[in-house]
Amino acid sequence: MNKTELINAVAETSGLSKKDATKAVDAVFDSITEALRKGDKVQLIGFGNFEVRERAARKGRNPQTGEEMEIPASKVPAFKPGKALKDAVK
């Protein structure tokens, strides 16, 4: 399912117009993104948790030259599914 299909599903199940469903979906994504940018954790009970995880610096290789290089530490978004979502998928 892509974003357009998600918007269509939200519009159909909620009775919203596609324009309003688009605004709602975008607002949810923007809210989650902003919370993660601030370093907050987003907990949606039953669905799952969005959080920012730290990746440690590590050694890697340039695939073109084979030269060893240092990959700097970074932050990455992560999602951990909740119990209800896990059970629904089984």
Swiss-Prot record:
SMART domains with a match to the protein in the record: BHL (SM00411)
Pfam families in UniProt: Bac_DNA_binding
Keyword tags: DNA condensation, DNA-binding, Phosphoprotein
Positions of region (Disordered): 56-90
Gene Ontology cellular-component annotations: cytosol
Gene3D superfamilies membership: IHF-like DNA-binding proteins
Positions of modified residues (Phosphothreonine): 4
Keyword Phosphoprotein: yes
BP GO annotations: chromosome condensation
Molecular function terms from GO: DNA binding; structural constituent of chromatin
Record family assignment: Belongs to the bacterial histone-like protein family.
Summary of the function given for this chain in its UniProt record: Histone-like DNA-binding protein which is capable of wrapping DNA to stabilize it, and thus to prevent its denaturation under extreme environmental conditions.
Name the UniProt record assigns to this protein: DNA-binding protein HU
